[in-house]
Amino acid sequence: MNKIFSSHVMPFRALIDACWKEKYTAARFTRDLIAGITVGIIAIPLAMALAIGSGVAPQYGLYTAAVAGIVIALTGGSRFSVSGPTAAFVVILYPVSQQFGLAGLLVATLLSGIFLILMGLARFGRLIEYIPVSVTLGFTSGIGITIGTMQIKDFLGLQMAHVPEHYLQKVGALFMALPTINVGDAAIGIVTLGILVFWPRLGIRLPGHLPALLAGCAVMGIVNLLGGHVATIGSQFHYVLADGSQGNGIPQLLPQLVLPWDLPNSEFTLTWDSIRTLLPAAFSMAMLGAIESLLCAVVLDGMTGTKHKANSELVGQGLGNIIAPFFGGITATAAIARSAANVRAGATSPISAVIHSILVILALLVLAPLLSWLPLSAMAALLLMVAWNMSEAHKVVDLLRHAPKDDIIVMLLCMSLTVLFDMVIAISVGIVLASLLFMRRIARMTRLAPVVVDVPDDVLVLRVIGPLFFAAAEGLFTDLESRLEGKRIVILKWDAVPVLDAGGLDAFQRFVKRLPEGCELRVCNVEFQPLRTMARAGIQPIPGRLAFFPNRRAAMADL
């Protein structure tokens, strides 16, 4: 077990570091309590809104924030992260919930948890850092656009029997449904969104989510007095408990232990075929969860001066996503906005995230009847604000203005693919394209430079600068071959060649074979890695054709 869970992968790392290695005092608990309550106030409406956006009833978002929030806080590797349902998952979870129902979504969440633990055990935590900013910005902006589009129906109260799955068809259907706008829903949505936008400018430390929802409810009261009809959580969502009792809105009880694949009234059947069908979505959830949770941890490190444990965080995220489905929780990861609010509110340890989850549980037990009165247009306004923040429009504009053309192409491609297809295709294509463009950029840096030295006319002395890898070597040796006419000796100085890969080695060997008769290649100042690569390949000096020297002086000794 110790070999599997090393110090870099072991769960509970953040909790141990924050509360065991550092003295946990009453003063620190007070700060965590205040931070936990602050974040809990933000999390309650967001968790419900994100569950609705994911195609399931709002209580499942609360179950996620409660159960996954506690498990990940205690077992993860980032002491300030607050986990729960996040906006990034909406575009993945909604199609799964529509096709397979809640049970299929819970099974996919469980599978994603297994993937996350495997990523942590394989120490993939630091590999996430190699995903280019242009890729992450492209797909997060694309997700923001998609989420924003998905909220227009509820925000305006449009009457739509069916919402198409493809983005362009969805936009067309929304446009055609505009004549069915519900003025009451639209008024509530606009007021709620307006308060969310302008609240931060007031300088009040209380998060704007609660005042915005209260204002939306006040407008709903006016609409009802005027005889209008407004869609609420209670009017749109119904539940059936295990004992057969039914109700509207949100059940006033704790999350119940269930088998994710065996829910009451579910048509989902757990088979190898169903698991195989869910695996791509589960892997997408795991990839997105890993990226978002580790990006969140990096942001928090910058805010607090601490250092997260990337692989421990992946293991903690995996445990949370494995345990949560047994209590009705959907996919969870660290939420950047809630985690940043946690830090700003004075959090000192993962205990603040636990307190935030406890507050969510108390809301389930005490406030469920009141939460059922929340208007759906106000929930949509919350998600529109989340979508705007997630799009990071200011960063997109900055990249368009100042970044190299290659990065702009990658970002726009990732954004478009995320909107038109899905995140997995966007990230896969984006990483491949970014890698190819990066290799082209590096290949252009590999070149031949003249060495100023007094030698006979039939001797050529050049310095190779840059890595000799597959994308650069062929062009470099082709250039060198064009300079060989009338040369008896060619001296190549390799002191600026840090890397020689298999492609570079192959190009080098073919160049040696193509050397004109009577021309000798002398290689000197070879660095360790290229020297080791040639030694492993069995490259040997060839009298009169190929020779190796420790330095340029030795290579020129007999000229």
From Swiss-Prot:
Q: How does it sit in the membrane?
A: Multi-pass membrane protein
Source organism per UniProt: Escherichia coli (strain K12)
- Per the UniProt record, one Pfam family is Sulfate_transp
Name the UniProt record assigns to this protein: C4-dicarboxylic acid transporter DauA
**Localisation:** Cell inner membrane
- Give the matching InterPro entries: S04_transporter_CS, SLC26A/SulP_dom, SLC26A/SulP_fam, STAS_dom, STAS_dom_sf
User: Organism's domain of life?
Assistant: Bacteria
Residue stretches making up the STAS domain: 449-559
UniProt keywords (A-Z) are: Cell inner membrane, Cell membrane, Membrane, Transmembrane, Transmembrane helix, Transport
By sequence similarity, the record places it as follows: Belongs to the SLC26A/SulP transporter (TC 2.A.53) family.
Please give the residue ranges for the topological domain Periplasmic: 1-32, 76-101, 148-177, 234-278, 335-350, 394-418
Task: Using the record, list the residue span of the signal peptide; answer none if the entry has no such feature.
Answer: none
Subunit organization: Interacts via the C-terminal cytoplasmic STAS domain with acyl-carrier protein (ACP), an essential component of the fatty acid biosynthesis (FAB) pathway. It also copurifies with proteins involved in fatty acid metabolism.
The GO molecular function terms of this record are: fumarate transmembrane transporter activity; L-aspartate transmembrane transporter activity; secondary active sulfate transmembrane transporter activity; succinate transmembrane transporter activity
Give the GO terms filed under biological process for this record: aspartate transmembrane transport; fumarate transport; succinate transmembrane transport
SUPFAM superfamilies found in the cross-reference section? SpoIIaa-like (SSF52091)
- Reactions it catalyzes: succinate(in) + 2 H(+)(in) = succinate(out) + 2 H(+)(out); L-aspartate(in) + 2 H(+)(in) = L-aspartate(out) + 2 H(+)(out); fumarate(in) + 2 H(+)(in) = fumarate(out) + 2 H(+)(out)
Cytoplasmic-side positions: 54, 123-126, 199-212, 300-313, 372, 440-559
